[in-house]
Amino acid sequence: MTSTDDTEAERVPGKRRPVGDTREVRYRVAAGTVVGAIVLAVLGALMGPQWTPVPMTDPLTVQAESTAIPGAPTTGPYPVAEKIVEVPLDGTTVEARVLMPLGVDGDVPGVVFVHGAGTGVFEDAFVEQAEALAESGVATLVPNKRLDTYTVRHRDYVTMSEDYLRSFDLLRSLPGVDPDRVGVYAESEGAWIAPVMAADQPDIAFVVLVSAPVVPARQQAAFAVDSYLRNTGVPQQVFRAIPRAVGMSIPGGGFEYADFDVAPYQRRMIQPVLVAYGTADASMPLVQGAEQIIRDVAIAGNTDYTVRYYRGADHGIRVDGAVSPAFLRDLTGWVQGLPGTGSVWPRIAGDQPEQLYWAAPVPQPRWLGNGDVLVFLVLGAVGLVVLLPLARWSVVGVQHLRGQAPSPGRDQVLARRLALLSATSVGTVVALVWYLVAVARLALGYERNGWIVQGGWLGVRLLGLAAVLAAAAVVVRLRRLRQSGQPLARGVVGHVVLWGTCAACAALLVVLAYWGVYQLGI
């Protein structure tokens, strides 16, 4: 197409023929494409961090296959009474569901549940766990999550711990509950909150941490993305996007909680701790999490820990959507048997966990680490590519309506190449976004699809290469026009459209390089 365009332009009567023949044009465009791809590859490598997770070479070894808690008493089942109570908080109240076992001799232990990110109301949260505990003779309280101070962008785990301590105090005050045997059960995000509660309130009798991230949310997110992508089978080049996406500041601000470190609070925990993971949970650092909890509580002089791994269970110790019966048995037995069950052997038992890499601190992007700047750059460039041609057409339309003679037309070959450059640049950005969304859906569904994962990435890269080819063709045409003495554009609007489009497309190509479209193994 390139050589044909130039040949056609040379045949237009009255025009000076641009220097160079068809073969030279092809050579220059091909050479420009190669050079452009290499330059973009180098820029992409230099602009941000690489993703080189550190392999875990010293895995945690289970001491027994059975997760059963030795010495755990067998109690119940007891009939259960349910009531809804209100928990007064600072500035508001939340409802909570209390389950109380009936017919138990003496006061019973109690458990307050702390929500993760995926739950919020007691009707849907911890139903199986609370009922199993209550039927075994343990009072339970599941509060609604306070939502007026909890958003996607803003949440404060220390303040949330203070709210949950109100639920703890309420359960301890109920008739029939032993105030010295009330503990907390926290799952997922809640495992960043429960250690704060335990550190600040030593009257908490025990702590259960289920599917605990342990590391800060930013590290856990990068680890989870890496695990999901490996399970999905994406090309190695895609992994470069992990630190650049997870490490940047999120557009619009907020998300300070992403760097909250729970370790200082875990190092003040003196309560017995039950740590539980499902070995099919790809989102959590199964080995690292348990090891860090053991090390952290040891700093407080606490050696009362129990770690359990459940075969085939995913996040929340669920198998096919239901909480593992073995986990419910172990949970109720461990709570009922305290303090004796707090340090019984085996300390670490169940399915052997596997963790390929450490959930380490995420490298920070050097150039495009500000999400607001990145979004502004992409949207601004796309806007220019779309609006600048419209501006030129508007000027031509106004001239026509006024009966004015239109300005001399621009070079048609250059116009076609600019249109191709604009279309391929924007098209590659759209294709990349589509690919990342499609891969995310596959990853979250634990699915594989070679056509999307491998074929989609190949398609994105080929489209990106077509954009570089179009850019090279534009540069070659500009050079030929300049050498032949012809104007590159006509009028102020023409120059604005030409150079504005070139600058916008160049910005898009650099952004694509940043996200790995032009990687060459460097």
Feature locations, PLM:
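Alpha/beta-hydrolase-fold serine-hydrolase catalytic core, especially in secreted/extracellular enzymes
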Residues: 3-10, 27, 302, 312-314, ...
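N-terminal cap/lid segment of alpha/beta-hydrolase-fold proteins
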Residues: 51, 58-106
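Short beta-strand element of the alpha/beta-hydrolase
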Residues: 106-116
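The serine-hydrolase catalytic nucleophile loop
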Residues: 119-130, 145, 287
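Conserved alpha/beta-hydrolase
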Residues: 130-150
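Alpha/beta-hydrolase active-site loop
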Residues: 154-175
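Primarily recognizes the serine-hydrolase "nucleophile elbow" in alpha/beta-hydrolase
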Residues: 170-230
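Short beta-strand/loop motif that positions the catalytic acidic residue
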Residues: 269, 275-277, 281
